[in-house]
Amino acid sequence: GYSGFDAMLLAHEIHKATNRFARVMTHHLWFVNPATAIPARKLGFEEATTENGLTLLKKNNLIILFPEGEHGNFKPSAKAYRLQEFKRGFVRMALTTQAPIIPTVIIGAEETHINLRQLKFAKYLIGGVLPLPLNVLPLPAKWKIRFFEPIYLPYKPSAANDSELVHEIAQDIQERIQNAITQELSKRDAIFF
């Protein structure tokens, strides 16, 4: 969701399970001025670039990223749980560093903060798409976070340069996650407490 609650709760769950802090790859607008950049770094946020991700992974850090990018995070709530096309950077990072990809599904974040639409014109003003939220305070949605088995890509680091392969891997992972989301939604009995 647009608020970042999903990333923070996911980081918390990872810390509980592993006793390690995961770095959260976030929208570049967090880092445009010190008023937001300083708290963002203290929260464990890093600007979502392939270079930053590679640096963190090479230092054996855990990272959290949402492959849809801003178009997924800021999509209107009318498109809830319909994944937008995955960007390819996460696959390239995994191949280059030989790090596993751990698919994760979060149910509940889409209802916690309602987004009316994307403000696409903001891209021309500030360099990024922004949401138009209905609520600032979170709604009491029930959440479920489900981790799946790690995916170890059976290719050499040089495969990161094969655009066709990278695209196929990203599509395959997106389909798996979309199917898992659909399955989890079918089990849900109520949205709110």
Residue locations for each model-derived region?
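Non-catalytic C-terminal accessory region of glycerolipid acyltransferases
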Residues: 55-193
